[in-house]
Every structure is written in structure tokens, then in C-alpha cells.
């Protein structure tokens, strides 16, 4: 990375572009500690969203300027580089899409699932990370504001859609709506239980009923 200087400004830029990796690491560690598959479902959703984002990249074909910072190559997805022309597509922004997807996927379930408590500090933190990412990418010429806006739009729509898919499939336990709220108590309506009773006399079955 030519001309790189270790400074507070460069560290801020570097951490801003590393935000997607930090989010993945945090959610993976959360799943390891809690021994659940939530991070796997989340990563599957981000993979689908990335494919949709790459589709729009090839549709728009907005290329990154030659004087873009080397920091822009920290978070590079396959198929986002035009190998024939050696050009990198920059819209919709992949990092903005990723953070926005995470924001929607975590925030929306909090509003529509018990205990219906939104973790305001978490939502504000993710929103702040998104703003920092947009500013850092623009300053480093990784993309323009339109690319960041489109990435944010694609990410939020895909995050909401992925939540809807998981929620409607009956696997609400794989969502994050209760993990990051202050109240961990969740009440659900108990499911019906059935009992099968068999009546025998002298070793012969007289009656069988289900209660």
C-alpha cells in the first residue's frame, strides 16, 4: 500500500472500511457463545444480497476512478472487477449495502416480534457506522454518494426481505430480535399437547383414543 502512513486519520479510514468484517466477527462470536445458527442464516442472507448487488453493478457499470485510494481494495467481492478492462465497479456500494442489510435485518424484527423493544443504542450505532462508511468511501473516492445511496437502498430492501422470508418460514428463533434487547423474557402461546390412550383387557386392545 504505497504512501501509507500510520496516523489517527488513516486508522479511522481503515476501520471504517473494515466495518463489514467487524460486524461478521461480532455476530459469529455471538453465535459461538450462544451455540445457535443465527450467524449462519445472517451470512446466507448477506450472500444473496451480495449477488443482487453485483447484478446491479453489472447493470449500471459505474467504474471506480483511477485515483481512488488503496483503502478501497480492503473490501472487494468476486465478480466486481471487469477483468478485461481491469476496472472495478463502484455502484451500488458493497460496504454500504452490507451495513444497511445488517441494520434492517436486526432492527425490523425488534419492532414486529415480542417483546417489541427496539435497542436504540444498537440501531444508532449501526446507523452511525453507515454514515461513517459513506463519508470514508466518498473521501477515498471508492464510490460517489449515488453509489452509497444505491448500496444503502439495496441493502435495506434485501435485509427486510430476508427477515420476512425467515419469519414467514416459522424459524423466528433464528432471528436477532431478542438477542440485542434489554428484556430477554419472551412469552409465547403454548402449543397444544396430545396424549394417546390405549385400553387393554386380558392382553387385548379394547379402545384407543387421542386426547
Identify the function of each model-found stretch.
Residues 1-211:
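Terminal transmembrane helix and immediately flanking juxtamembrane interfaces
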Amino acid at each position: 500500500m504505497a504512501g501509507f502512513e500510520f496516523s489517527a486519520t488513516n486508522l479511522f479510514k481503515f476501520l471504517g472500511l473494515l466495518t463489514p468484517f467487524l460486524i461478521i466477527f461480532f455476530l459469529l462470536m455471538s453465535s459461538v457463545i450462544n451455540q445457535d445458527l443465527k450467524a449462519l442464516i445472517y451470512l446466507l442472507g448477506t450472500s444473496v444480497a451480495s449477488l443482487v448487488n453485483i447484478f446491479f453493478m453489472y447493470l449500471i457499470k459505474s467504474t471506480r476512478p483511477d485515483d481512488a485510494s488503496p483503502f478501497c481494495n480492503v473490501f472487494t467481492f468476486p465478480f466486481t472487477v471487469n477483468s478485461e478492462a481491469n476496472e472495478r465497479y463502484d455502484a451500488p456500494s458493497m460496504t454500504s449495502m452490507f451495513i444497511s442489510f445488517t441494520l434492517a435485518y436486526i432492527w425490523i424484527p425488534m419492532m414486529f416480534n415480542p417483546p417489541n423493544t427496539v435497542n436504540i443504542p444498537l440501531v444508532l450505532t449501526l446507523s452511525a457506522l453507515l454514515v461513517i462508511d459513506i463519508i470514508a468511501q466518498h473521501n477515498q473516492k471508492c464510490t460517489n454518494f449515488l453509489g452509497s445511496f444505491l448500496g444503502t437502498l439495496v441493502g435495506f430492501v434485501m435485509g427486510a426481505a430476508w427477515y420476512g422470508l425467515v419469519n414467514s418460514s416459522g424459524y423466528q428463533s433464528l432471528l436477532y430480535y431478542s438477542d440485542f434487547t434489554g428484556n430477554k423474557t419472551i412469552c409465547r402461546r403454548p402449543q397444544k399437547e396430545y396424549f394417546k390412550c390405549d385400553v387393554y383387557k386380558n392382553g387385548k386392545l379394547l379402545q384407543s383414543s387421542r386426547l
